[in-house]
Curated annotation (Swiss-Prot):
GO biological process: alcohol biosynthetic process; isoprenoid biosynthetic process; mycotoxin biosynthetic process
Gene name tied to this protein: janG
Chain sites annotated for binding Mg(2+) 1: D122, D126
Cofactor(s) named in the record: Mg(2+)
Site (Important for determining product chain length): Y154
Residues given in the record as isopentenyl diphosphate binding sites: K83, R86, H115, R132
Organism in which the protein naturally occurs: Penicillium janthinellum
Protein name per its UniProtKB record: Geranylgeranyl pyrophosphate synthase janG
Residues reported to bind Mg(2+) 3: D246
Catalytic activity from the UniProt record: isopentenyl diphosphate + dimethylallyl diphosphate = (2E)-geranyl diphosphate + diphosphate; isopentenyl diphosphate + (2E)-geranyl diphosphate = (2E,6E)-farnesyl diphosphate + diphosphate; isopentenyl diphosphate + (2E,6E)-farnesyl diphosphate = (2E,6E,10E)-geranylgeranyl diphosphate + diphosphate
Length: 364
């Protein structure tokens, strides 16, 4: 009985005593949200909004967080320097397109933020632990906040397109995001279903995924210039070269391993370019597929896998194809230089992506 009485009194206080009363706020006689009305048959008459709330600054930031909190996973990864190959590529193509600095800055920011957002999602989907030698963002901020920051970046850059002032930019941006997700979907399917793609399927995935941001950068630049030159084949080649080299270096380079995590593609179960070649080179041997299924972090096992890929000639195959693709790319650049003028920037990027053959002298 006493419990019921106390509960009733507490409910009455919560409903009918002004909020300000508990904060030392002294309301005027009319400052009540509900007033006793002796003339009403119900005894009480609701009078909402009779009293204005005390004039205080909004506390919204306390609950939702300022922009810095929403962006925190993005800014964390942005603070860790990467290769910035996309920024170099934008500068290189601008030797031909000649955009002013303000227009170029928009393209650079859109590409940089989209790339960073895609890395945040990739690291979650791949179960990565390191990115550029530091703990991945979702290990620091949590998965939910990291996903939210990545999605926020997509829409933030979509809004930025209005500064370009060309309706084609939105269409270009949308197509690029669709391509990125198509490529990522193919990559994830092969890994999760443990299905080894053909080399042709892999190249198609790379054109969607890695080449997608390269194409987006160039097309956003072109809508702001008077250029009608078709750069698509060159951009496609650059994307393929970049990704094959990235796959190669993940398994071969000690410096790269220190920064990203030793032979991380094997831990992720990824069908990278040398892995695909090795599996198809000896389909009767299931060792490499078995190692990928394990998602192992054991370096001894991963080194064994790398040695096996050496035995199937897979790394040599990567080097030979990279040399062939680079030769094609340089040929395209020289053809374009006839009408557009010299472009030292793209040649410098191809030099940067060069992988030495055994016994080859380093590029000067």
């Amino acid at each position: 009985m006493l419990y019921f009485l106390a509960e009733t009194i507490f409910g009455f206080i919560c409903q009918y005593v002004p909020i300000g009363f508990w904060n030392g706020y002294s309301p005027a006689p009319t400052d009540r949200y509900r007033r006793l009305d002796l003339k009403s048959s119900q005894g009480f008459r609701a009078e909402p909004n009779l009293a204005p709330l005390p004039t205080t600054k909004p506390r919204r930031e306390r609950y939702y967080g300022p922009n810095q909190i929403i962006r925190a996973p993005l800014d964390y990864l942005l603070s860790i320097p990467g290769k910035d190959i996309r920024g170099k590529l934008i500068n290189a193509f601008n030797e031909w397109l000649q955009l002013p600095d303000d227009k170029l800055a928009i393209v650079k920011e859109v590409i940089n933020l989209l790339h960073t957002a895609s890395l945040l999602i990739d690291d979650i989907q791949d179960g990565s632990r390191l990115r550029r030698g530091r703990p991945v963002a979702h290990e620091v901020f949590g998965v939910a906040q990291t996903i939210n920051a990545a999605n926020y970046a997509y829409f933030l850059q979509q809004e930025r397109l209005s500064e370009i002032g060309d309706p084609r930019a939105f269409h270009i941006f949308t197509n690029a995001l669709l391509d990125l997700h198509r490529g990522q979907g193919m990559d994830l399917y092969w890994r999760e279903a443990v299905v080894c793609p053909t080399e042709e399927e892999y190249i198609r995935m790379v054109i969607y995924k890695t080449g997608g941001l390269f194409r987006l950068a160039l097309e956003l630049m072109q809508v702001q210039s008077n250029s009608t030159t078709d750069f698509s084949e060159l951009v496609e080649l650059l994307g393929i070269i970049f990704q094959i080299r990235d796959d190669y270096m993940n398994l071969q380079s000690g410096l790269y391993a220190e920064k990203k995590g030793s032979m991380e593609d094997l831990t992720e179960g990824k069908f990278s370019y040398p892995v695909i070649h090795s599996i198809h080179a000896a389909p009767e041997n299931s060792m490499l597929v078995d190692i990928l299924k394990q998602r192992t972090e054991d370096n001894v096992v991963k080194v064994r896998a790398v040695h096996y890929m050496e035995s199937t000639g897979s790394f040599q195959y990567c080097r030979e194809n990279l040399a062939r693709l680079t030769k094609q790319a340089r040929h395209h650049v020289k053809e374009l230089e006839v009408s557009l003028g010299p472009n030292r920037g793209i040649h410098a990027i191809l030099d940067l992506l060069h992988v030495q053959q055994p016994n080859e002298k380093p590029l000067v």
